[in-house]
């Protein structure tokens, strides 16, 4: 038992979060002691009560907390006496307190030991069993020893922080989708949790194979159904997410390992948990953003499989009339199941700004915050305000604050209406300068076509999306059809196709790349120049697709040096000759440019001018590389800021050099459509802004209400700032003076 005890302590100590540590503890104690129930009650001395924080065997109700006063129940008695209590039949003890919601009436044997550190009671550790018996001395000694070890791992500061969640009223988080929402918080009690699945075996593997097969089929049908549903509307980005889910679900290796686990004697639920977690951990251990997000996708798949394995979850859910979803994690499938006419906001404990769930809430226009460090159960059925602009969550707000946010929501609705009135007008400054508003495309062609009259062309088409949704490299013919559709859709406007940009944040399932530091590794143009056959096939497809329209711009991603540009141009010229030989006539020459996202190229602009026709500044990666920060890492995401003075000075230098050397300058990335950044970019000299479709209306509204001189003045003052907060204060004041403060916060 000593070895087992050491293993449990090491696993608990290495858990990244207290809740995870407690779940590991109760699970491993049940396995080690061969007992049916293990629970941890932690003491909140401010409220003089215990919280049931983790259990295996009892029914811990979703969406609310289970508490016991210090003077209640046998658990309370263990704490008051500060010594173990070992009972053969706990229900006959005068201190026994029945709690219907946890379903413990089946269990008779009870052993509870206090968790004490430096004379301070931290909690009570309990095991229970149906059998009428006292736990023997070795079992009691084992549990007492574990409680002592737990006391050393736990600290009062940890518990104070944990229980502080129940009293928090304002919680900082990451803004994931703009907007303001007010409603009751709601945790979905029907969603199965992976941590609630425990190891269990079966004597009928054939039955478990049948159950697993059924769950896989149900999930596949579900993903196809959601894909068709969203494809039928304007949400093509969302449809593409479910296509990717279907692709992951059909992975041969994943299915093989699931059935292998069942064949070893595991029940289907345990097979799903072990295999999905193994795959997800492999992805999560890698450092690049895209692979980390795929770990979340795999867990979402696992959750859906567990859902379809549980017959009890197949009934309808009683959603409130208006609610804000609160969850530990969020999947696109969960969002798709929710009644869209009732869902007004989302709060997620874990999540990245570029996860599929984040993409989807932005596409649906649902105000969302992620990285809110609070348990969802604490927020269930409480009045919440989600501020997706500031990245704030307000819990049980005072009436005055509630009234103020309700006013902001009304004004936000009016502002959206005003912006839509301008969307079909040209993006022209008050001083007369014409700004080109371009579209970042690649996920939703039908929706993009609807924006055709509102934009000046496609500033960035992400060609990697079709590559990611297939089980192998698309053929040249398939690519021709794909690109032809986009070039013809906007045949009177420039269309910029970016060559394959994979690696690091975007991986192909059939071309896995494992590196210690993938963000600085084999990605973008580095891959396609090392694999010229991939590059040549893609460029030939682009040139063939452009033969009839002549509006093609080719964009090279992740360029680090001039020799990469030279080699890429050489291959493009070769592809052009091959296409002309194939079709027998001369084809239009495309314009060739680079995505400026690596800091080294900022200093090479005079030499680039002789090699490229245009430059498109990719602000997302350029910000990350200049600041050396991963914006999807919640620990450092607050450092990521495109308005950092160093970033602004880099943008100013790029604009200045581009003007001197006559380079056609463009900008894409989140800055291009961010109302907090647009005026500064205009003042710095940027005239081509490429943004996501949802940003077009508000960007045009802003542009038509400023003139160049005042934008230039704002940009110059921002360049003199020393901190990003100074810049933001300047922009906020600038916007408020012009009656456009509502574009950067709630309200008008």
Swiss-Prot record:
Pfam families: GAF, PEP-utilisers_N, PEP-utilizers, PEP-utilizers_C. The active site is at 356 (tele-phosphohistidine intermediate), 668 (proton donor). It catalyses: L-histidyl-[protein] + phosphoenolpyruvate = N(pros)-phospho-L-histidyl-[protein] + pyruvate. Keywords: Cytoplasm, Kinase, Magnesium, Metal-binding, Phosphotransferase system, Sugar transport, Transferase, Transport. Optimum pH is 8. Residues 171-748 are annotated as: PTS EI. The EI N-terminal domain contains the HPr binding site, the central domain the pyrophosphate/phosphate carrier histidine, and the C-terminal domain the pyruvate binding site. The GAF domain is an important site of signal perception in prokaryotes and eukaryotes. The reaction takes place in three steps, mediated by a phosphocarrier histidine residue located on the surface of the central domain. The two first partial reactions are catalyzed at an active site located on the N-terminal domain, and the third partial reaction is catalyzed at an active site located on the C-terminal domain. For catalytic turnover, the central domain swivels from the concave surface of the N-terminal domain to that of the C-terminal domain. Component of the phosphoenolpyruvate-dependent nitrogen-metabolic phosphotransferase system (nitrogen-metabolic PTS), that seems to be involved in regulating nitrogen metabolism. Enzyme I-Ntr transfers the phosphoryl group from phosphoenolpyruvate (PEP) to the phosphoryl carrier protein (NPr). Could function in the transcriptional regulation of sigma-54 dependent operons in conjunction with the NPr (PtsO) and EIIA-Ntr (PtsN) proteins. Enzyme I-Ntr is specific for NPr. This is Phosphoenolpyruvate-dependent phosphotransferase system. It comes from Escherichia coli (strain K12). The gene is ptsP.
């Amino acid at each position: 038992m000593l070895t087992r005890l050491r293993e449990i302590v090491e696993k608990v100590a290495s858990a990244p979060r207290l809740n995870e540590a407690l779940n590991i503890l109760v699970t491993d104690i049940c396995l080690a002691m061969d007992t049916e129930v293990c629970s941890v009650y932690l003491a909140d001395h401010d409220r003089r009560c215990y919280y049931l924080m983790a259990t295996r065997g009892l029914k811990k109700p979703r969406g609310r907390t289970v508490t016991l006063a210090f003077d209640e129940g046998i658990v309370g008695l263990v704490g008051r006496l500060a010594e173990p209590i070992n009972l053969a039949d706990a229900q006959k003890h005068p201190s026994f307190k029945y709690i219907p919601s946890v379903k413990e009436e089946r269990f008779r044997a009870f052993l509870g030991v206090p968790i004490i550190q430096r004379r301070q009671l931290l909690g009570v550790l309990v095991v229970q069993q149906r059998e009428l018996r006292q736990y023997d001395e070795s079992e009691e000694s084992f549990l007492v020893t574990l409680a002592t070890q737990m006391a050393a791992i736990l600290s009062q500061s940890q518990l104070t922080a944990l229980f502080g969640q129940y009293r928090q009223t304002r919680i900082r988080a990451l803004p994931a989708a703009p907007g303001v929402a007010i409603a009751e918080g709601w945790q979905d009690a029907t969603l199965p949790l992976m941590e609630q699945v425990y190891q269990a075996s079966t004597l009928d593997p054939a039955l478990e194979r049948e159950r697993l097969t059924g769950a896989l089929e149900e999930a596949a049908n579900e993903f196809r159904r959601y894909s068709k549903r969203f494809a039928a509307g304007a949400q093509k980005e969302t449809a593409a997410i479910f296509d990717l889910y279907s692709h992951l679900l059909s992975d041969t290796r994943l299915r093989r390992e699931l059935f292998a686990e069942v064949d070893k004697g595991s029940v289907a639920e345990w097979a799903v948990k072990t295999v999905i977690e193994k795959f997800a951990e492999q992805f999560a251990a890698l450092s690049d953003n895209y692979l980390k997000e795929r770990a979340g996708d795999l867990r979402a798949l696992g959750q859906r499989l567990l859902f379809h394995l549980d017959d009890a979850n197949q009934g309808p859910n009683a959603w409130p009339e208006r609610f804000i979803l609160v969850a530990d994690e969020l999947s696109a499938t969960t969002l798709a199941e929710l009644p869209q006419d009732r869902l007004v906001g989302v709060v997620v404990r874990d999540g990245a700004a570029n996860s599929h769930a984040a993409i989807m809430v932005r596409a649906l226009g649902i105000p969302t915050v992620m990285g809110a460090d609070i348990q969802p159960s604490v927020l269930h059925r409480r009045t919440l305000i989600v501020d997706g602009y500031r990245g704030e969550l307000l819990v049980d707000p005072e009436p005055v604050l509630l009234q103020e946010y309700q006013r902001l929501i009304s004004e936000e609705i009016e502002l959206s209406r005003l912006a839509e009135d301008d969307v079909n007008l040209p993006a022209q400054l008050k001083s007369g300068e014409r700004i080109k508003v371009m579209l970042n495309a690649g996920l939703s062609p039908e929706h993009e076509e609807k924006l055709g009259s509102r934009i000046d062309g496609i500033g960035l088409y992400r060609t990697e999306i079709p590559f990611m949704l297939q089980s192998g490299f698309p053929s040249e013919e398939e690519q021709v059809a794909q690109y032809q559709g986009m070039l013809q859709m906007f045949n009177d406007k420039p269309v910029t196709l970016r060559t394959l940009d994979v690696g690091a944040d975007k991986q192909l399932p059939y071309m896995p790349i494992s590196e210690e530091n993938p963000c600085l590794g084999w990605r973008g143009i580095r891959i396609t120049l090392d694999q010229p056959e991939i590059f040549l096939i893609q460029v030939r497809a682009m040139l063939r697709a452009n033969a009839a329209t002549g509006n093609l711009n080719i964009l090279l991603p992740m360029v680090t040096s001039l020799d990469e540009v030279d080699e890429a141009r050489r291959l493009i010229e070769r592809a052009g000759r091959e296409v002309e030989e194939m079709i027998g006539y001369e084809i239009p020459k495309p314009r060739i440019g680079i995505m400026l996202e690596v800091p080294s190229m900022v200093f090479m602009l005079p030499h680039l001018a002789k090699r490229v026709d245009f430059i498109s500044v990719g602000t997302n990666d350029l910000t990350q590389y200049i600041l050396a920060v991963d914006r999807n890492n919640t620990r450092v995401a607050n450092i990521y800021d495109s308005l950092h003075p160093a970033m602004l000075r880099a943008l100013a230098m790029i604009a200045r050099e581009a003007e001197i050397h006559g380079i056609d300058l463009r900008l894409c990335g989140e800055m291009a459509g961010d109302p907090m950044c647009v005026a500064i970019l205009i003042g710095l000299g940027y005239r081509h802004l490429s943004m996501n479709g949802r940003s077009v209306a508000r960007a045009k509204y802003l542009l038509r209400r400023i003139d160049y001189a005042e934008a230039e003045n704002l940009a110059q003052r921002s360049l003199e700032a020393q901190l990003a907060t100074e810049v933001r204060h300047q922009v906020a004041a600038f916007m408020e003076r012009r009656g456009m403060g509502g574009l950067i916060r709630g309200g008008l």
